[in-house]
Regions:
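Beta-strand elements of modular eukaryotic interaction domains
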Residues: 84-85, 121, 131-134, 207-208
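Acyltransferase/transacylase module recognition
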Residues: 1-118, 252, 256, 260-375
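Conserved SAM-binding loop
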Residues: 122-123, 217-218, 332
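Residue-level signal for helical boundary/lining positions with a hydrophobic bias
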Residues: 13, 121-123, 246
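Beta-strand segments within the central parallel beta-sheet cores of soluble alpha/beta enzyme folds
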Residues: 117-123, 147-150
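Alpha/beta catalytic cores of group-transfer enzymes, especially the acyltransferase/condensing modules
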Residues: 134-295
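Gly/Ala-rich beta-loop-alpha elbow adjacent to hydrolase catalytic centers
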Residues: 98, 119-127, 131
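Short glycine-enriched nucleophile-adjacent loop
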Residues: 101-102, 128-139
Length: 375
């Protein structure tokens, strides 16, 4: 049933981050869907051209794989066999998946937006970038144009964040691990003691980048993550899950990337944020205050690169924007592990909700870094 057949509903669009799934199944699902969607097929063709054009502008070998592939499916197939995580490839594939899901969703439901009323948008980490397009695009043509422009911006943001991380520690490896069933306050105290005891310089210190009531994700250079997880008695005894992030994000102690270079001067930047759209900041749990796409992207880049991602406040912020008297449809723009938290919060608040998967994919693959020396 398409959404135009559902009366009086409130929509919540959810865009997950780049760590949430093996990229190949979701790209394959999009590729299959494009066989019956000319617009999605055109977007996927445009996506590889944009990625290759942006790659050619780089002076280094960053993203060189993109220049040797004829489409995003080939990129995903090659990356699925990779032994080491590559944040540029992983993030770009995840972004293509989110933008592609948005194109597909709007192609199916074009012309029905007025019947569904206000739309709430939740994006987690780089998922916010696709959410920005959803907040500004009033029709399928605008969706298509803005996805292409913001994909280029997103590519440059990933390059900037990877460069910032490699300037701290150039060796490949994972920059994060997630601790289960430990409070943020307790973990912060342990991290402060750890950083002080090992006399780590500010840029190499371990920090909490993502927090929730049930788990917290700690970021640090790969050598530090390796030592904490395997050789430090306090942390190695804690329940933890390897997290597929290969760059530092949500890092308030690091320098802000060059926003002017990242955003550039594309024509769609002056597109206004639509009055019936609300996109939640993952650091404040409140709607971003932005009049245009450019202003929104500037705030989103700060949330991704500098600000703590608070899962619980984001989910609560979404629920505060909703009318309890009306049913809720959650549109999953690809897999997101945070949808169960949202559905629980809605149920606790007395909402009736249903989740529809626009596109689906596998659960995360677990990549383990190679053994490295102690910091």
């Amino acid at each position: 049933m398409f959404l135009q057949e559902i009366s009086n509903v409130q929509r919540v669009l959810v865009f997950g981050d780049s760590t949430i799934e093996n990229k190949l199944p979701v790209i394959r699902a999009l590729w299959k869907a494009s066989e019956s969607s000319l617009l999605l097929k055109t977007f996927l063709q445009q996506a590889i051209e944009i990625i290759q054009e942006e790659t050619q502008k780089l002076a280094s070998q960053e993203g060189s794989l993109f220049l040797h592939c004829i489409n995003v499916l080939e990129i995903a197939e090659i990356y699925a066999e990779a032994e080491e995580p590559d944040e540029i490839i992983a993030s770009v594939l995840a972004l293509v998946a989110r933008f592609g899901a948005l194109v597909l969703d709007n192609e199916h439901n074009d012309g029905s937006r007025q019947s569904t009323g206000p739309i709430q948008i939740a994006g987690f980490c780089t998922g916010l970038l696709a959410g920005a397009v959803a907040a500004c695009a009033k029709d399928i043509i605008t969706i298509f144009d803005l996805t292409c422009e913001v994909l280029a911006i997103s590519f440059r943001l990933v390059i900037a964040l990877v460069r910032r991380s490699k300037a701290i520690e150039p060796e490949p490896g994972l920059w994060a691990t997630t601790f289960i069933r430990v409070s943020r306050q307790e973990l912060e105290m342990q991290l402060e003691d750890y950083n002080l005891y090992h006399n780590l310089p500010r840029e190499k210190q371990a920090y909490i980048g993502v927090t929730s009531q049930l788990w917290n994700t700690v970021f640090a250079p790969p050598s530090v993550i390796q030592h904490m997880s395997e050789s430090c008695p306090i942390f190695s005894q804690m329940s933890q899950v390897s997290t597929t992030a290969a760059m530092a994000v949500h890092a308030s102690h690091l320098s802000l990337p060059d926003i002017d270079w990242i955003i550039g001067s594309l024509p769609g930047l002056n597109t206004p944020v639509l009055p019936d759209r609300s996109i939640i900041s993952t650091s404040t749990g409140k709607p971003f205050l932005a009049a245009t796409l450019q202003e929104l992207l500037e705030s989103i880049i700060a949330d991704i690169s500098m600000n703590l991602l608070d899962i619980d406040s984001t989910v609560q912020g979404i629920c505060l924007q909703l009318d309890m008297a009306r049913p809720v449809v959650i549109s999953a723009m690809g897999p997101s592990p945070n949808i169960p938290a949202l559905t629980r919060e809605l149920a606790n608040g007395g909402f009736k909700s249903k989740t529809l998967a626009v596109i689906s994919g596998d659960r995360p693959r677990r990549l383990l870094p190679q053994a490295r020396s102690r910091p």
